[in-house]
Amino acid sequence: MRKIWHQRDILLQAGGGSQFVVAGKFRIHKAYKYLHHSGVQVPWKRLVCNSRASPKSTFVMWLAIQNRLATKDRLIKWNILVVSTCGLCNQQDEDISHLFFSYKYSTEVWEMVLQNLGVQRSVLQWQEEVSWAVKKSRSSRKSDVSCAMAFIESVYGIRLQRNSQIFSSKVESPLVVANRILFCVACRQ
């Protein structure tokens, strides 16, 4: 009830609501826009929201972009006792930027995917790859849509392999993972 009265007070402060009347009719849309504080626009919105990638992959991407995946560095921050080293390379501490494209396995997977899509460039760091995928997601060209979708599916595929290594000590070769990613992209076009 307090929230309703608070919103009423805000409307009264705005001039009694007369600014929301057009041609003698109260426009709820105008009042809503006035009362509703719009959130900050994020640059990755089109990458996640307009993706043709599978819903599971898109959700994992959404978590990864916001650095909300349960990587070992985050588990340690939550006071969960885990070994901080990466489950795939067993050399460096696992965080989002390490997991995605800072070690050999993920780099090989992403390189193979890029080569099969006809993209001739080296693998970049996590934030640079996200920026590249965001740029591709803004385009309507089929090749760019495929690249953005492949990026999302690659993040998901690498995440699955990381989980498979941790929970069942099994990891597929980068070629198998890359081919599965490309198959998913081809099926969803």
Walk through the language-model features, giving the residues of each.
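A helix-boundary/hinge signal
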Residues: 1-189
